[in-house]
């Protein structure tokens, strides 16, 4: 039986008089991890926004299975809780709100210390604030990860940790990164945006 997966069918998108995609088709397989490549301005981030429902498209169809959860790394740095630990726990389901172990494991993996957990999220540098958002994303355990330049601001140990996490992640991944070594080490396929289409 065919497992229902996210699917793009005959997708077309123009932007400012320029055609980014024309009749693009994509059907992900379970566990597939795709590295998306293409020159700047080719539409990689726009494709992410279309999948997330944040950007309209001219024609075609985006099919997302019911209850299929897509997670993406937010660049907006808005924090409401007094400590890093409590901020990250916000994303947990109500019955897991106090499962700090799950949160702490992710925070430690991304370079936070035990002392950091009780600090104000706003007291950290922009790079570490992005990591807090990355922890919040990973803690939600989505079916699919859309990661746009997730290696920015990461030091070597955190990079290694994220690499291991993505490799072990059981869901689907589409990744945009300029770090080709990182991409090659975590993806199963590379897909290019070329001549207004997607090519594996």
What do these predicted regions represent?
Residues 1-200:
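ABC ATP-binding cassette signature C-motif
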């Amino acid at each position: 039986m065919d497992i229902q997966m996210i699917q793009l069918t005959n997708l077309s998108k123009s932007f400012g008089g320029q055609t980014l995609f024309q009749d693009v088709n994509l059907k992900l397989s379970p566990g597939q991890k795709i590295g998306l490549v293409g020159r700047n301005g080719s539409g990689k981030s726009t494709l992410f926004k279309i999948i997330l429902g944040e950007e309209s498209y001219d024609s075609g169809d985006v099919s997302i299975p019911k209850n299929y959860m897509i997670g993406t790394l937010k660049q907006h740095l808005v924090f409401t809780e007094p400590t890093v630990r409590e901020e990250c726990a916000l994303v947990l389901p109500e019955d897991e709100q106090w499962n700090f172990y799950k949160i702490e494991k992710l925070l430690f993996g991304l370079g936070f210390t035990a002392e950091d957990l009780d600090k104000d999220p706003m007291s950290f540098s922009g790079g570490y604030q992005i990591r807090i958002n990355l922890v919040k994303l990973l803690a939600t355990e989505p079916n699919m990860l859309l990661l746009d330049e997730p290696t920015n601001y990461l030091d070597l140990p955190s990079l290694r940790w994220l690499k291991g996490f993505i490799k072990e992640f059981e869901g689907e991944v589409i990744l945009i990164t300029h770090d080709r070594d990182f991409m090659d080490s975590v993806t199963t396929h590379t897909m290019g945006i070329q001549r207004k289409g997607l090519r594996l």
